[in-house]
């Protein structure tokens, strides 16, 4: 159990009885690997280096020094360390969550780099982000650049009754929807997005 902001959260630290679980599932399930049922081309990975803005760099250094000062001579909890790491990552993404819970935007180069990348790409694109704020920022910029009908979402704030419809729109070759933006926490598993030839990780998880 870890404590996040005064809230106790159960954390998985290991697994037990996996062989027993596997035996019980064998009677009514079978496993098929992706390469056994789909003829897919090899994946090609490409990294983009994005320079921090002066404002980002200043805030990042301030937060880093604060975290180091808190750590000196103290035993920090796992939750506290994760919170500091999360804030540093948020700053890299162009925002951070203040102590009062409000989200503060920071001038950054990510959205410009994303739009430049999209100009180079033909076909449909899946864009993953780690934070809901990032998803909403991406949606705002893509709608402005490509129109409101060009994009659908699949993340925590997407209503349950719209999620499957959004996938169908994205998968439909005649649909005007070209972009699907979501979080891997919500849409990273169990959905089919084979209409896309490109997948972009705008911000990674841990």
Residue ranges and their predicted role:
Residues 43-45, 147-150, 195-198:
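Short glycine-/polar-rich loops that comprise or flank the Walker A/P-loop
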Residues 126-128, 136-139, 143-187:
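Conserved helicase ATPase core of P-loop NTP-dependent helicases/translocases
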